[in-house]
Amino acid sequence: MKTFKHILKLIEEQDLIMAELQLTSVGEVELPAAEQHYLWGLLFAKRSDWKQAQTHFLHAVALDPQSPARETLEMLTNIYDYHYKDNLNP
C-alpha cells in the first residue's frame, strides 16, 4: 500500500528506510509528483539533509502552489534564517 497517508505515517514514525523504499517504487499514477516531492522533502528533513529537503519542497510548490510543502518550506526557511543570520549579511 503506497498511499500518501501510509508513507507519511512511516516518516512520522521514523521508519525512514521503509518510507524511502515505498517512495522509490511509487509511480505518478499512484501518487502525484507534487505529493511525492513533499514526502521526499519530509524524509530528507527527518534526516537533517536540509538542502535536499528544500529542493523537494520547492519542486512540490512549483507543481502545486497549494501543496502543504509551501508552509513547511516557509518554516524551514525561517528556522534557517534565525540560526544562520550571518548568511543574510554578506
Residue ranges and their predicted role:
Residues 70-90:
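Terminal, low-structured helical/coil segments at or just beyond the last alpha-helical repeat
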